[in-house]
Amino acid sequence: MPIMQEGRDKRMPFLFLSPSTQYFNPYVTTGDERYWMNALADEMMPYLHASGITVTRNDPDGSAAQSIRDSNASRQDFHLALHSNAAPQALAGQLRGVDFDYYPTSEAGLRMANI
């Protein structure tokens, strides 16, 4: 359940924003997954803050395991991992869109996946 933010009359979520730490996944054009997903997170931050959402970010130089530990320790309402997916050669250029993963027993996770 979201935590009441001081000075607000509605409840706003606390978000752990976790862009990829995978520098070893190069992109075809330039850069790598860590670079581009962190650039995306940088662009998202002003919009999230303007919406009243409190955001904590992972350490881009850390590991995925450290990001998970930090997220769990911070007790955020929602963990948003930003990653890009590769396709097998047979499906190159055919897959688009986003994937949402959540615990099957999490009603809140299902609600967030359907937003």
Please describe what each predicted stretch is:
Residues 2-26, 31-115:
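Active-site-proximal helix/loop segments of hydrolytic enzymes
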